[in-house]
């Protein structure tokens, strides 16, 4: 363990649930598995209350923390859309009696997790196989994940250090690539005005695509949830099956664009709550064809790995990696 003998409290705060764990940053696999818990955010008035409850539940103490939140971190505060908590770093640290507390974006944590992932933590989705870089080897990675929304980030590895890219790339404009997708854009524009990638590639995005597909077919889409769309697709419903096909193809196109934008030639990691659930669809769809279909760069894109992250606690793992990196920056710690 580091100079501080206590483990670090790490958290992954989403719109509905909050996950906590203790991490020993001196270990290659830093998460202390027996300490991992998940709580509904609605059960607690604040992040500090949830964190304190967790420490009480596991009978542990901590004086440092890294909390990843599903929103933009702006100075001392983090804001999550439609979330009951107003998250203040300083107030939360004071409430917990912490000497040090970092708030980071959830996809900064997902990106940092790449530095600790093992080959068994990922599943190849077409293309080249992933070979983790050797210590000190420069690497550029992208990360993208559909869940309640669409998270986008990246990771730059230089001289043994990790530099996460915090972005709001899920909100860039949706670029249709086929006549069908142009029509889907037109239909969604009638509802939303501007249409971002997140309007299609996330859980609610499945419903949006399904509604557009049904409108093109002259069929009432009904009032469905994302799980209803995927369930209907499994049972052979034509519109639901087409929805999943469009989702995977657009996801692939966007992931490929992200690689080009970030120069992430060493691979893109697919995370988020939907990726494990839709893994079979991603592997047997147009995802990879659209990922590679980049004109003069198609042959280069064919060599870029696309990898589904299957680690059950990647956000917590990334928060632990961030904590380890922060320790190396601490005064008196040799690089």
From Swiss-Prot:
InterPro entries registered for this protein in UniProt: ATPase_NBD, Bacterial_glucokinase, Glucokinase
Keyword field: ATP-binding, Cytoplasm, Glycolysis, Kinase, Nucleotide-binding, Transferase
Enzyme class name: transferase
A Pfam family reported for this protein in Swiss-Prot or TrEMBL: Glucokinase
GO terms under cellular component: cytosol
SUPFAM superfamilies listed in its UniProt record: Actin-like ATPase domain
EC number(s) recorded for this UniProt protein: 2.7.1.2
Molecular function in Gene Ontology: ATP binding; D-glucose binding; glucokinase activity
GO biological process entries: glycolytic process
Main localization (coarse): cytoplasm
Subcellular location: Cytoplasm
Binding-site positions, ATP: 11-16
Catalytic activity: D-glucose + ATP = D-glucose 6-phosphate + ADP + H(+)
Family: Belongs to the bacterial glucokinase family.
Name of protein: Glucokinase
Lineage, highest ranks first: Bacteria, Pseudomonadati, Pseudomonadota, Gammaproteobacteria, Lysobacterales
UniProt gene name: glk
């Amino acid at each position: 363990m580091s100079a501080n003998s206590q483990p670090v409290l790490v958290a992954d705060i989403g719109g509905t649930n909050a996950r906590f764990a203790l991490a020993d940053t001196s270990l290659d696999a830093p998460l202390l598995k027996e300490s991992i818990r998940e709580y509904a955010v609605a059960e607690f008035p604040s992040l500090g209350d949830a964190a304190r409850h967790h420490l009480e539940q596991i009978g542990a103490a901590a004086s440092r923390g890294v909390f990843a939140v599903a929103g933009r971190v702006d100075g001392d505060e983090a804001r999550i859309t439609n979330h009951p908590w107003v998250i203040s770093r300083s107030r939360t640290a004071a409430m917990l009696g912490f000497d040090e507390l970092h708030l980071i974006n959830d996809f900064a944590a997902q990106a940092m997790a790449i530095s600790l992932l093992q080959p068994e933590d990922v599943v190849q989705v077409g293309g080249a196989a992933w070979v983790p870089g050797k210590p000190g080897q420069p690497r550029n990675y992208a990360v993208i994940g559909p869940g309640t929304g669409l998270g986008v980030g990246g990771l730059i590895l230089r001289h043994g250090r990790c530099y996460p890219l915090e972005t709001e790339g899920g909100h860039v404009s949706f670029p249709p690539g086929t006549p069908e997708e142009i029509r889907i854009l037109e239909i969604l524009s009638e509802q939303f005005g501007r249409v971002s990638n997140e309007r299609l590639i996330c859980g609610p995005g499945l419903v949006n695509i399904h509604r557009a597909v049904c409108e093109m077919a002259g069929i009432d889409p009904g009032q469905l949830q994302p799980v209803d769309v995927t369930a209907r697709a499994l049972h052979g419903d034509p519109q639901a099956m087409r929805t999943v096909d469009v989702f995977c193809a657009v996801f692939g196109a966007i992931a490929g664009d992200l690689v080009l934008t970030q120069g992430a030639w060493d691979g893109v990691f697919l995370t988020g709550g939907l990726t494990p659930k839709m893994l079979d669809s991603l592997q047997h769809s147009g995802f990879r064809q659209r990922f590679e279909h980049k004109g003069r760069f198609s042959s280069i894109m064919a060599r870029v790995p696309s990898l589904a992250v299957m680690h059950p606690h990647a956000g917590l793992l990334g928060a632990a990696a961030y904590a380890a990196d922060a320790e190396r920056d601490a005064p008196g710690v040799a690089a």
